[in-house]
């Protein structure tokens, strides 16, 4: 994920990507459908609408200075997961370091995980274990925003909540089949939600990259 910010015409670009998998299709992340953006002025989001396509998403938050009079810019990125064993999903971030505390910080970008749902009839429903969104990421930052003690907008979880490779989700197997290829209906979908509230930031340009990784997770019987 990359973020780029400019004074008065703040442009925030997030690029989501997936780390190369070493587990074949036994553990897999792909696009979960077309991402959406609301509340943006001159903003956009691009991604793959096909659930068998790679997860590569570019988000342009557009104008995020007070010239954007909307309360928040919200982006929802559906992410499809497939596994035939217990799994965990981790996210790592690089970039977005500003020495000036009045410039955009990682803590200014809300980030949460919501809306788990089956991806078709071959998605596995387990009765002995559930899919767990790790604290503090189980929230929609766009509806949980508040004004902090420092006068800046705060969220229950943000990009600053990521430290190294941070596990955000884990659970039991996701797929009924053992196909070596992605199918249209063989897993689960979760929504990664990003929120940025238009406000005053010191001028500058920033960038960051988010990498999503799926790997074998803790024991979770199905």
Language-model features: locations:
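Positively charged n-region of N-terminal signal peptides that target proteins for export
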Residues: 1-5
């Amino acid at each position: 994920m990359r973020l780029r910010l400019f004074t008065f015409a703040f442009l925030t670009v997030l690029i989501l990507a997936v780390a190369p998998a070493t587990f074949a299709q036994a553990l897999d992340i792909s696009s979960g459908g077309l991402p959406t953006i609301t509340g943006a002025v001159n903003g956009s989001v691009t991604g793959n609408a096909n659930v068998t396509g790679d997860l590569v998403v570019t988000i342009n938050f557009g104008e995020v200075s007070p010239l954007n009079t909307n309360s928040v810019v919200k982006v929802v990125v559906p992410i499809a997961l497939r596994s035939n064993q217990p799994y965990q999903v981790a996210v790592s971030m690089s970039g977005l370091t500003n020495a000036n505390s009045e410039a955009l910080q990682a803590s200014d970008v809300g980030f949460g995980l919501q809306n788990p749902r089956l991806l078709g009839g071959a998605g596995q429903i387990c009765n002995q274990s559930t899919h767990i969104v790790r604290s503090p990421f189980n929230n929609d930052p766009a509806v949980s925003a508040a004004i902090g003690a420092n006068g800046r907008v705060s969220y229950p979880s943000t990009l600053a909540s990521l430290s190294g490779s941070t596990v955000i989700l884990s659970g039991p197997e996701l797929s009924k089949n053992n196909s070596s290829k992605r199918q249209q209906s063989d897993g689960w979908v979760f929504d990664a939600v990003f929120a940025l509230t238009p406000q005053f930031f010191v001028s500058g340009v920033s960038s960051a990259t988010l990498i999503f990784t799926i790997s074998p997770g803790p024991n979770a019987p199905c």
